[in-house]
Design a protein with these regions (language model features):
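Hydrophobic alpha-helical transmembrane bundles of multi-pass membrane proteins
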Residues: 2-188
């Protein structure tokens, strides 16, 4: 997700802004956006839980963390929009859902449910701020791919290095080395 988000940012910068008439266009069909988000959420279970290639505890943990993180992110996005004086919306709920899926993907099978709630909560706030920043910048990323996928993927990878078993949170030198590998992966 980090690489696709950064590629989208590079593409948006390279292509420049759209014509003014298409920039302020409202979403055409909100029910289809919600249907798409629901189908993404459903498909993501196979993506995260199926990545273990076994029907074991890791797959169950990935499944549970995927659902928990997405639900947490959806509610966090709506709540943060309300805190910032914006009206809660179905579009915001759909974006929050996708941000939660992106945020938990690197660590879905390797963190506890409580950690997945924390990860998705923090990353959702960061992505919400990134979407706000993008909307006030000269970058024309029509689908907010960088603020959601790029930012969520980058911080999801960093937080994975902190929270996985044997990661930075373990307090050992080996955990510090694991965390540095995650930082290096983000930079590269």
């Amino acid at each position: 997700h980090a690489s696709s988000g950064v590629a989208a940012l590079a593409g948006a910068i390279f292509l420049g802004r759209r014509k003014k008439s298409t920039i302020d266009a409202e979403p055409a069909n909100i029910p289809f956006v919600l249907l798409g988000a629901a189908l993404l959420w459903l498909g993501w279970f196979g993506f995260n839980a199926g990545s273990s290639l076994h029907a074991d505890g890791t797959a169950v943990k990935a499944f549970l963390n995927t659902n928990t993180a997405s639900a947490t992110a959806m509610m966090t996005w709506i709540f943060f929009d309300c805190l910032r004086g914006r009206k809660p919306s179905a579009m915001g709920a759909a974006v929050g859902c996708v941000v939660g899926l992106v945020a938990i993907t690197p660590s879905a099978g390797y963190v506890t449910v409580g950690q997945s709630i924390f990860i998705s909560f923090v990353i959702t706030i960061i992505c919400n701020i990134a979407v706000y920043w993008r909307s006030h910048s000269r970058i024309d990323d029509a689908l907010d791919v960088f603020p959601t996928h790029g930012t969520g993927g980058i911080f999801g990878t960093v937080l994975t290095g902190i929270f996985i078993q044997g990661g930075l949170i373990s307090g050992t030198w080996a955990g510090f080395i694991v965390f540095l590998y995650h930082i290096l992966a983000v930079v590269i």
